[in-house]
Amino acid sequence: MEDVFSYFEKPKDPIRFNAIKISIASPDKILSWSYGEVKKPETINYRTFKPERDGLFCAKIFGPVKDYECLCGRYKRMKHRGVVCEKCGVEVIKSKVRRERMGHITLATPVAHIWFLKSLPSRIGNVLDLTLKELERILYFESWIVLDPRNTPLRKKDLLSDEEYNDLREQYGPDGFQAGIGAEAVRKLLEEVDLEGLDVELRDELKTASSDTKRKKVIKRLKVIEALRKSGNRPEWMILTVLPVIPPDLRPLVPLDGGRFATSDLNDLYRRVINRNNRLKRLQELNAPEIIIRNEKRMLQEAVDVLFDNGRRGRAITGTNKRPLKSLSDMLKGKQGRFRQNLLGKRVDYSGRSVITVGPDLRLHQCGLPKKMALELFKPFVYNRLQEKGYVTTVKSAKKMVERETAEVWDALDEVVREYPVMLNRAPTLHRLGLQAFEPVLIEGKAIQLHPLVCTAFNADFDGDQMAVHVPLSIEAQTEARVLMMSTNNILSPANGKPIIIPSQDVVLGIYYLTRSKEDVLGHGMSFSNPEEVRSAFDAGAVELRARIKVRIDDELKETTVGRVILYEIIPEAISFDVINKVMNKKELANLIDYCYRLCGEKTTVILADRLKDMGFKYATHSGMSFAVRNLNIPKNKKDIVVRADRDVLEIQKQYMDGLITDGERYNKVIDLWAQATEKIASEMMGGIETEEQITTEGKKVVESFNPIYMMADSGARGSNAQIRQLAGMRGLMAKPSGEIIETPITANFREGLTVLQYFISTHGARKGLADTALKTANSGYLTRRLVDVAQDCIITQQDCGTVDGISVSALMEGGEIIETAGERVLGRVVLEDIMDPFTGEVLVGANQEIDESLSEKIDRAGIESVRIRSVLTCKAKYGVCARCYGRDLGHGHLVNIGEAVGIIAAQSIGEPGTQLTMRTFHIGGTAKFEEHSTLDSRHDGIVKYVDLNYVVSKIGETVVMSRHGEIHVLDEQLRSRGKYTVPYGAHLKVKDGQSVKRGDRMAEWDPFSIPILAEVDGTVKFGDIIEGKTMQEQVDEVTGLSRKVIVEFKGADLRPRVSLKDATGKTAKVPGTNAAARHLLSVGVNIVVSEGDQVKAGDIIAKIPRETTKTKDITGGLPRVAELFEARKPKDFAVISEIDGVVSYGKDAKGKRKVIVTPEIGDEKEYLIPKGKHVSVQEGDRVIAGEALMSGVNNPHDLLMIKGEKALARYLVDEVQEVYRLQGVKINDKHMEVIVRQMLRRVKVIDPGDTPFMADEQVEKFRFQEENEKAIARGEQPAIGEPVLLGITKASLSTQSFISAASFQETTRVLTEASLAGKVDYLRGLKENVIMGRLIPAGTGLVMYRKLGIKTVADEDAESVEIEGDENSNKKSLDMHAAN
């Protein structure tokens, strides 16, 4: 009996190996895999359906078709296991071997492997130093190659055409020299390659290489040779002599009805190879003419090419239905390939899906599961329970009973389901909260019920959405589902640490209604001694819900309303009444939940959320709120505003006709006008809706209105002011699909209705919106996929890496306003060094301490501007990152656990809001956007302080700013900066240094439509190289007939249009304080305002650079911008930036480009070429610092890395990405971006390899680089020199150490070719490669340190207690993991 199990093979355990290697298969290796040669192209006999002998499905080679049964039927069943039948030669064994046994085809002539030939760069070509064209001519029998020149003047590897070959043969005789053709010749050459010798030779050549191209070529060859040398692969293995045949069950042939067969394309491809191979063998035996044999060899080469990679060379071979056949490569590639279809995503059993509907009476940890569905999902458990209870004895009878659906079955199901977590998932699962665990509640009906508060996390609504249910089977899976995935354990969003379970829509409306107050209603002004009294009075109908009353709470008389006291009943005791004694809108409710979570913990918060939901629904129903047309009040003076705007537009038109303004300015002004009119009507309308007159005992009184539409928008339940504006105000300006704004606005609103033309104009935008949305989803999904791929191996691997490096974080400013204080930005991070109070000098936060909410407030109160914190960017951990550098796990609010997959969380957090970003590139036309940016108002009370501000007083007494980087700071009483405002060049200052300002005071203003060029000194205008008709044109406006002097593009001559100022002596004046001349070079498009010989004073405008008007420069925004940043692409018009500190001067123009020279105080000057027509943003004599832009344009991240280093670059990337998300109102914590940027900066480019094994220009991982250098230094040799490189996320994913991960991402063929050539080893460190290999992932509970936890049982007291003990411990095992830190 004990031997019976040895009959069954144990399933192979995927955990047993810890690395996997890929290399090129040698012919011997292929033969060792094979169980026999496939000689015939036949597959199966069409009459008997039995496989043909020696054919592609031969049972003798590949194993029996039926379990333990030979083909002729002589041996059947287990007792003959392992016998080989004498008659048909089939081994009696399980038929499963047909999935793993391989065969082979012995090729009549060698054939090149297309991957090594055509995958660029050609590997065979690299080894032999032949180009791909030359190789193809040899392999496809067009040219001969000289193998051994002997005594002839030919050189080895010379190519000869047929004619040349024949002539030379005649000349030198048959033994004069040796030449070959086809794959045999190439194989011969590859066999002769001496890798060691070639390696030495190439390294010497590299030292003497003169030109850059030569070096690059040698380096490329050296890489391939090195890879072959180190991996132990032989070059001739790239040419095949034996072809493996994959197991038949992996290329099945299935009979359809009607005698036809459905087959895998591979069978056709193999058939072609076998047919051609057999024909070639026959021709060779018959000694056929060389030309025929050669043609057959070429056809065999092509057949093998198509089998390996169809379409790689020439046209793809198509099958019967004009569809290209799927080759072996296609089986791996793309979304439908093996990697992504079957290994990374599999179908799941024990799952079901159905439509969802709302379950308002569920608790947060519950979901409603239809009985029918539950019965199907839990069937095996129900069978077991019925057997346990003794209703049935066998599974068969249990099955029958369940089919009858008797009462016992439902009882059993109830017991099985009780407290058994199931997982609900809604596609698309954009972040980890798209899959959560709930306890099922059995319900009638066929729809799954979902708790309303988790809808935000799932992004679900009930307009027909479907969700899937999955049952975790093992006890470990159940524990993980309960501990880690239960909806009650996922209150905070992992993206930003704010609660994601917050009331929305109806609930918000109900609670808003409950906490609003109303004048003069029943019970107004009553006083109560405690909340209970209020409740009884309300129940008795003695006081109305919104009445203002006084109540004694915590020995204090509070003014409040009845509704708020009722709300107070459900608030946890720890939270004071003042927190909710206000109108509770959505924001306040989110804050309440956040506050409750921090103060009272998870459990209390869950209870509070549920109570809020119940109360919200109840009072939303009570309020009887409705949406009616009468609620939309159109403002009385709308007509007047529109008429006035029309009049103003005509006025502007007239100015244009008179030539006072240009067409662009006219367009901008009109757009501005209408934007203002729309704004005005909207504010009038909102004013009308927000307030209403109420007749009270004190007479008429204006009070906040109870207009339902206003309440919906004000509470944050649904709708926004912008939408109400379109319903009752005026629709306003519309954009064309190109992004330009149409001058004529829609003056009607939806209540009045649109005319046909107005409707047509608005369809433009609407259609573009729909097209955008469709594109956006695909693009956003692809971005997420790239992010996940680059960050998937970023896991918390240790507690502390012990680094002494970190980054500085200061408050985030935008337009002078502090958007996020330093304290808020470092919340949940670990401090690098002690933070001192700048005034008292006491230590606020000790080094290596995590900053929690209270410390964050402390930092802000102390007015600390910048904090040094630890960051993943500077983490020293070799694999993954350490917990201290990462900081707080935002989803749970404590320091992150070891094993957390922070890379994937980062990728999800950035990718998930991707669909909310806009797709388009913004065109900031002349909309109200500009108008905001032409003035500067103080946002705080305080004292003005000029910083780096140079100014002059112009002749009309205006203070004009002359500096380019000037700032105005507003300081408070302690002289701490409250606001920093950058003042542009040419602005007019309205405040003096040291003056005190109030909030809202105007501090500066400037012309929004052009950038001025100002005179620095008094003097006379002199033009240089401004030649009419060549460099300058008087452009006459067609409409107005007025002229302007405009610099135009000019070809040829070395002309530099400029304006200089001459002093009294006629010399060029000097700029005060410097040695530079008062001279301005003008770029194309500048309008000159002065004429030659004019007298000007300092501060006067000489010329204007118009800001692009109708279509301003496209600001790449939204999703494309995020992708551009993460892909580290060079922007289209990137700015040239200075590499050094120094003084600017202009050099002689070269090749139509401006030459800007930066001269440092010590060292060599640097020259920069700037294309003409681009505006140079520095003047002669300006001081610049390293990293400062010399012209207008976007930064190029690669330059930033080179000049300012990794931290500055990381800061730039993080801030730029954040900017895009902030515009859409999405909050994502900086640390997620930092994780991605860390992955982009993982590699170093070797500049000088020193005595290390690296090659010049090779890119290597930072840690490998450091390791090799340490080794070299230890040996007393020269270490390598390298510089950091920035890789885009796609490049970074493909250059990861794991070839399995890279191959499953993109460019599968290329990755596998490279990996096999180099004999790469994948140590399975990331998540993806482990999923593909079918192992537990090395993160979370799959970490080795958690897997090794044992279970200790207490000494046997009695069997039962031991059982329980073991059970508890196995639960504990997973729980411990949660609290491991």
UniProtKB/Swiss-Prot annotation:
InterPro entries: DNA-dir_RpoC_beta_prime (IPR045867), DNA-dir_RpoC_beta_prime_bact (IPR012754), RNA_pol_asu (IPR000722), RNA_pol_N (IPR006592), RNA_pol_Rpb1_1 (IPR007080), RNA_pol_Rpb1_3 (IPR007066), RNA_pol_Rpb1_3_sf (IPR042102), RNA_pol_Rpb1_4 (IPR007083). Keywords: DNA-directed RNA polymerase, Magnesium, Metal-binding, Nucleotidyltransferase, Transcription, Transferase, Zinc. It catalyses: RNA(n) + a ribonucleoside 5'-triphosphate = RNA(n+1) + diphosphate. One of its GO terms (molecular function) is DNA-directed RNA polymerase activity. It comes from the Bacteria. One of its GO terms (biological process) is DNA-templated transcription. Its cofactor is Mg(2+); Zn(2+). Binds 1 Mg(2+) ion per subunit. Zn(2+) 1 binds at residues 70, 72, 85, 88. Residues 1369-1381 have a biased composition (Basic and acidic residues). Zn(2+) 2 binds at residues 801, 875, 882, 885. The keyword DNA-binding does not apply. Its EC number is 2.7.7.6. Mg(2+) binds at residues 461, 463, 465. CDD domains: RNAP_beta'_C, RNAP_beta'_N. SMART domains: RPOLA_N. Residues 1362-1381 are annotated as: Disordered. GO terms for cellular component: DNA-directed RNA polymerase complex. It is an enzyme of class 2 (transferase). SUPFAM superfamilies: beta and beta-prime subunits of DNA dependent RNA-polymerase. DNA-dependent RNA polymerase catalyzes the transcription of DNA into RNA using the four ribonucleoside triphosphates as substrates. Belongs to the RNA polymerase beta' chain family. The RNAP catalytic core consists of 2 alpha, 1 beta, 1 beta' and 1 omega subunit. When a sigma factor is associated with the core the holoenzyme is formed, which can initiate transcription. This is DNA-directed RNA polymerase subunit beta'. It comes from Syntrophus aciditrophicus (strain SB). The lineage of its organism: Bacteria, Pseudomonadati, Thermodesulfobacteriota, Syntrophia, Syntrophales. The gene is rpoC.
